[in-house]
């Protein structure tokens, strides 16, 4: 029976498997989940009935590579000096042409243009266009780099350094963050403060979330699947869905508004799951609504050694990912990391589960 492994970086986040497993084919970054599922001979979705009309829906997350964390922007190839040279060329030629036209107007003389003059004039126009284009291109690249550098410097240090990660096995992730009706169906209680069946379950600790996974796994035993919280790498990979932008939907606040409930559009409360647009993997509420517990203890990225292990665990805190209905927009970015003690319960904190094959 195949098993699904946790995500592992190419260089630094390798996880030792209990026994050898065959990697799944890697996603090419462009094909649809349905096309990948067909190529990998896997189901694109899975659904489990919890009774009384309550269902758990999962979507396939392909195996693949991505850059985890906030990368430093690449310096533009064109320099400020080349931009200044281009400006100088364009301005000089413009001045020459303007002087010629003014001289002609003042003297009233008509100049006869020979073929040589015509060629020189054409060359001057070409150089002017070239200079202006180079100047504009340089200006755009320089401004984009400066904006990217300002953004990079403003990010939390624990999102750096960016590092390559390899997801060796495809896995299934909850299409929605866990809901109150799902929690009620499995655990029998509902600790949420903002009660509504389709709202995210909130005010749950990491211990509560793992207890939910354990009990759900008992119910799923006959299906050969078990539930658990995602690793941090699995979560970010699934959230990004092949993107490199601030949010999986883009870089602007308007892009976030289309996919997430956050501080400026939530009205100070969580909302029913699936009310905004999904990412390209088919996952909802990854950048907003409620934060989500991950399996991992918190570790700074720079503390990882070549074997992918670290003794620098920040107490017993567990990783939190995702946006929140209480947060400003930039805090909902795909790379943002949080961590709290595992017994923390907050009204903007829930969880999402993944499925792995039971041994």
Residue ranges and their predicted role:
Residues 78-89:
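Juxtamembrane/start-of-transmembrane alpha-helix segments at the extracytoplasmic/lumenal side
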Residues 91-106:
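Alpha-helical transmembrane segments
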Residues 111, 115-134:
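Internal/C-terminal transmembrane anchor helices
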Residues 48-78, 137-192, 204-207, 287-288, ...:
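A short glycine-rich, aromatic-capped structural motif
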Residues 19, 149-166, 243-244, 266-269, ...:
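Surface-exposed recognition segments
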Residues 18-51:
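N-terminal pre-domain segments of enzymes
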Residues 66, 180, 196-257, 293, ...:
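Short, well-ordered surface patches within globular domains
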Residues 8-17, 126-128:
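Hydrophobic h-region of N-terminal signal peptides that target proteins for export
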């Amino acid at each position: 029976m195949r098993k699904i492994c946790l995500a592992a970086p190419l260089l630094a986040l390798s996880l030792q498997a209990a026994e050898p497993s065959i990697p799944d084919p890697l996603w090419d970054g462009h094909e649809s989940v349905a096309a990948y599922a067909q190529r990998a001979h896997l189901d694109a979705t899975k659904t489990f009935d919890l009774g009384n009309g309550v269902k758990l829906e999962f979507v396939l997350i392909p195996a693949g590579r991505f850059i985890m964390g906030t990368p430093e922007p690449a310096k533009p190839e064109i320099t400020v000096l080349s931009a200044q040279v281009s400006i100088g060329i364009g301005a000089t030629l413009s001045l020459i042409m303007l002087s010629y036209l003014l001289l002609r107007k003042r003297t009233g003389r008509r100049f006869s243009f020979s073929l040589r003059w015509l060629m020189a004039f054409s060359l001057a126009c070409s150089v002017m266009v070239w200079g202006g284009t180079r100047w504009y291109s340089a200006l755009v690249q320089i401004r984009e780099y400066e904006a990217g550098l300002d953004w990079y410097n403003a990010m939390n240090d624990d999102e750096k350094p960016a590092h390559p990660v390899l997801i060796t096995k495809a896995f299934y992730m909850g299409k929605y963050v866990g809901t109150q009706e799902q929690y009620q169906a499995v655990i029998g209680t509902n600790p949420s403060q903002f009660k509504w069946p389709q709202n995210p379950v909130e005010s749950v600790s990491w211990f509560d979330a793992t207890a939910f996974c354990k009990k759900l796994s008992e119910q799923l035993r006959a299906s050969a699947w078990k539930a658990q919280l995602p690793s941090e790498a699995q979560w970010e990979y699934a959230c990004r869905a092949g993107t490199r932008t601030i949010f999986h939907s883009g870089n602007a606040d308007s892009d976030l508004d289309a996919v997430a409930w956050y501080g400026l559009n939530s009205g100070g409360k969580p909302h029913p799951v699936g009310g905004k647009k999904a990412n390209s993997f088919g996952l909802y509420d990854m950048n907003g609504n409620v934060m989500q517990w991950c399996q991992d203890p918190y570790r700074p990225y720079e503390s990882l050694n070549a074997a992918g292990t670290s003794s620098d665990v920040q107490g017993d805190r567990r990783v939190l990912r995702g946006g929140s209905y209480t947060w400003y927009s930039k805090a909902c970015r795909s790379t943002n990391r949080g961590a709290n003690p595992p017994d923390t319960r907050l009204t903007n904190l829930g969880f999402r589960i993944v499925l792995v094959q039971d041994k």
